[in-house]
From Swiss-Prot:
Catalyzes the reversible oxidation of malate to oxaloacetate. Belongs to the LDH/MDH superfamily. MDH type 1 family. One of its GO terms (molecular function) is L-malate dehydrogenase (NAD+) activity. This is Malate dehydrogenase. The lineage of its organism: Bacteria, Pseudomonadati, Pseudomonadota, Gammaproteobacteria, Vibrionales. InterPro entries: L-lactate/malate_DH, Lactate/malate_DH_C, Lactate/malate_DH_N, Lactate_DH/Glyco_Ohase_4_C, Malate_DH_AS, Malate_DH_type1, Malate_DH_type1_bac, NAD(P)-bd_dom_sf.
């Protein structure tokens, strides 16, 4: 099993690479690519960790050697948020980066499962889809926006509020991956009751958690370490699924188009990527209103991505 991390010299990429070096199944190959010349050094550094995962690093303009033979490609390349920026401000730089990477993937490893971390995910995933469609290699079962960070934040914040073990808390999160499009389904958390005030406050905190970190880092970056953890969880889920295990995770995928052409929802993963898009259950009145209220934003984000490629 070969996993490629694209954008591996960045804050998310290095954290993700460290976690994968420690947690990928024995015999896996880990390829790191970044435009930054430090990347082979990041691989050399990680290669000293005594785990049965081989690692190579590649730098420069061409990601081809890292992508060759990849089963899973995790893309974290791009610029990070700074205070005062929202995820839309990232679009101007990151859209072009994702487009050119998708063009290479279409040629070099068109059958790989692709997990996109680069923000704004609501828009970068449709960009990748349009590029792959143009190349005639698009398989909607194999393209994912990684929204796992919203899930792990929700689990953490609920556990903190209710004094529970975060490893035991499960919170479904649907919609998109920025601001109001992030919708934690707190009504479905088992064994926990929330007041209306708690639901409103928790939902807002989960939606704004990225900004919380950007401001706390005071210009020194965005959420890189927790995102690395989230991306590792999702990447390992893909690896397990490709090896024949049945895994359920939440991801931003092309679904049946009920609400938007791309939507974060629970998916059953298997050897071909998405095996089945699962129902997300009954929504509370608060959640229904939040869902209705976000769709214009989410559909607008998606359209920006489609238009960018056309």
């Amino acid at each position: 099993m070969k996993v490629a991390v694209i954008g591996a010299a960045g804050g998310i990429g290095q954290a993700l690479a460290l976690l994968l070096k420690n947690r990928l199944p024995a015999g896996s190959d880990l390829a790191l690519y970044d435009i930054a010349p430090v990347t082979p050094g990041v691989a050399a550094d990680l290669s000293h960790i005594p785990t049965p995962v081989s690692i190579k690093g590649y730098a420069g303009e061409d990601p081809t050697p890292a992508l060759e033979g990849a089963d899973v490609v995790l893309i974290s390349a791009g610029v990070a948020r700074k205070p005062g920026m929202d995820r839309a401000d990232l679009f101007n730089v990151n859209a072009g980066i994702v487009k050119s990477l998708a063009e290479r993937i279409a040629v070099v490893c068109p059958n790989a499962c692709i997990g996109i971390i680069t923000n704004p995910v609501n828009t970068t995933v449709p960009i990748a889809a349009e590029v792959l469609k143009k190349a005639g290699v698009y398989d909607k079962r194999k393209l994912f926006g990684v929204t796992t960070l919203d899930v792990i934040r929700s689990e953490t914040f609920v556990a903190e509020l209710k004094g529970q073990d975060p490893g035991e808390v499960r919170v479904p999160v649907i919609g998109g991956h920025s601001g109001v499009t992030i919708l934690p389904l707190l009504s479905q958390v088992e064994g926990v009751e929330f007041s209306d005030e708690e639901i409103a406050a928790l939902t807002k905190r989960i939606q704004n958690a990225g900004t919380e970190v950007v401001e706390a880092k005071a210009g020194g970056g965005s959420a890189t370490l927790s995102m690395g953890q989230a991306a590792c969880r999702f990447g390992l889920a893909l690896v397990k699924a490709l090896q024949g295990e049945e895994v359920i995770e939440y991801a931003y995928v092309e679904g049946n188009g009920e609400h938007a052409s791309f939507f974060a929802q629970p998916v059953k993963l298997g050897k071909e990527g998405v095996e089945e898009i699962l129902p997300y259950g009954e929504l509370s009145d608060f959640e229904k209103a939040a869902l209705d209220g976000m769709l214009e934003t989410l559909n607008g984000d998606i359209q920006i991505g489609v238009d960018f490629v056309k």
